[in-house]
Amino acid sequence: MSTSIFETPLPRSDLFLCSNSLLSQNYKLFDNSRSFGLKSLRPRCQKDGLLYPKPLNFGFCRVSRRKRKPNFVLNSVLSVDKELESDETVGLGRSREYDAIVIGSGIGGLVAATQLAVKGAKVLVLEKYLIPGGSSGYYERDGFTFDVGSSVMFGFSDKGNLNLITQALAAVGCKMEVIPDPSTVHFHLPSNLSVLVHREYNEFFSELTSKFPHEKEGIFKFYGECWKIFNALNSLELKSLEEPIYLFGQFFKKPMECLTLAYYLPQNAGDIARKFIKDPEVLSFIDAECFIVSTVNALKTPMINASMVLCDRHYGGINYPVGGVGGIAKSLAKGLVDQGSEIQYKANVKSIIVENGKAVGVRLANGNEIFAKNIISNATRWDTFGKLLKQDELPKEEENFQKLYIKAPSFLSIHLGVKSDVLPPDTDCHHFVLEDDWSNLEVPYGSIFLSIPTVLDSSLAPEGNHILHIFTTSSIEDWQGMSQKDYEKKKELVADEIISRLEKKLFPGLQSSIVLKEVGTPKTHRRYLARDSGTYGPMPQGTPKGLLGMPFNTTAIDGLYCVGDSCFPGQGVIAVAFSGVMCAHRVAADLGLEQKSPILDAALLRLLGWFRTLA
């Protein structure tokens, strides 16, 4: 019988453990048990002035004595027999004030936290759940290690400036072993159109133009525009666009690149595509390309966002972290602690404390209050301003945001463990399926995204098995107003229908090969990811003016910042990591850890606010 993600009891566990110095090759528990609220279930021993469990073969981060600098290599995602204490809380009251509290430990929040910690700030991350990562977390069942969200990982290359995950890990002394994916996605589209997006751009271009030779020039020009934007972005040092000293410095160093980005800022991918391409089927293909990026078609997808993804997949490529996506958040959390900051789990923030118009702290579900100079919310803006802030009226800027953007639908997720022999030996890792009608692209359950991470990393599943991770859009309204029995029955029916479609299109015999099935609905994602309606993120209400209306990290409330996919530049791994970098830089400047000009700050923030009114 299928169950929702996390709806069955979890093993006591799932904390990241890494070696935290070169003193020993044994694996140590972080020497900050109060901060983590950890209670060891194993005997502990004393050595080198630190408490740690007796040596265990965790195999998470490995440190070599032969090198002066730690060489962290992720071997696998592991469970460790630890449990979290819900009644332990750090820094209660005003006896200890942090430089920043980060609400939530998604990738955006963790990047912001670690970047601040590296700059010297004292940061506390508060996570509602048992492990870090949010949508980039993981869970384990019966020997399978499942990624909670996407398994398509951008930003992991070793070159350029958009390899933001690599940079974030390196900043805190971690490096993860990755497996290059020879392709990004295999499209299976109406009229039996099949397009494989190869890692090498020239191979992808050749494949696409072989299907549409009459549009070769138009395809070349559209993707050429994408490369122009990507190359401009990739040449810049990426920091906060709300910090004028940095912004003007970049403009004087790279004026043409900055002007290129300014030109494309208010434009959408679909409009650019239509300048060069006339064939409606090619335009529909570009819609599908953009839908994966933004959950909307190309006419509603900002050109800058499309360019980041459509080019980085060839420039840096898709690289899967060995052991699973959950290792990214665990490594960042480990690095945060190594920098002297803290992370606390089972810490459910219920409200942000505002005094005299300034955000000064947070109140937890257990009534405890923790204070900081700055509060960074990694929740969506709907959760931040609709639930965490207890105000009668929305700030004007947030009111404008909610007029321009609505909550994108959530999704139905199906995690399968299947017998290996059901998949052909040359199966690609990622697939996008839209069988019959292009008009179903944005319809709930219309298209299916499928990842098979065990094609790249077989350690994620027991021998002789594969993992299939299936996504399709779904609205929370479809799952409300029914009894638990009807809810479970509907989950089973909808999941079986999706699986049957994949069986018919890709993998005959799929249904009978299933050894494990778990189904998550929008209600599941709302509960465990703490996202309003389980939303995937913001989507434009109408046709947007590119990214012009997307807010940055500062808010109308002094001392409160937002980070994540409802901030510039939006959804996706690169985008939220970029948001984290920008947020950390702006907060660091406000803390006096980076250069700052109060007069220029005020002028720039007013100017940016005015630009957003033009959207």
Swiss-Prot record:
Q: Which reaction does it catalyse?
A: 7,7',9,9'-tetra-cis-lycopene = all-trans-lycopene
Cofactor names: NAD(+); NADP(+); FAD
Q: What is its main location?
A: plastid
Organelle transit peptide: 1-62
Q: Which GO terms describe its molecular function?
A: carotenoid isomerase activity; oxidoreductase activity
Q: How does it sit in the membrane?
A: Peripheral membrane protein
* Keywords tagged on the record: Carotenoid biosynthesis, Chloroplast, FAD, Flavoprotein, Isomerase, Membrane, NAD, NADP, Plastid, Transit peptide
Q: Where is the signal peptide?
A: none
Q: Where in the cell is it found?
A: Plastid, Chloroplast membrane
Which pathway features in its UniProt record? Answer: Carotenoid biosynthesis; lycopene biosynthesis
**Function statement:** Carotene cis-trans-isomerase that converts 7,9,9'-tri-cis-neurosporene to 9'-cis-neurosporene and 7,9,9',7'-tetra-cis-lycopene (also known as prolycopene) into all-trans-lycopene. Isomerization requires redox-active components, suggesting that isomerization is achieved by a reversible redox reaction acting at specific double bonds. Isomerizes adjacent cis-double bonds at C7 and C9 pairwise into the trans-configuration, but is incapable of isomerizing single cis-double bonds at C9 and C9'.
Similarity comment text for this entry? Belongs to the carotenoid/retinoid oxidoreductase family. CrtISO subfamily.
- Protein name according to UniProt: Prolycopene isomerase, chloroplastic
| The species this protein was found in | Daucus carota (Wild carrot)
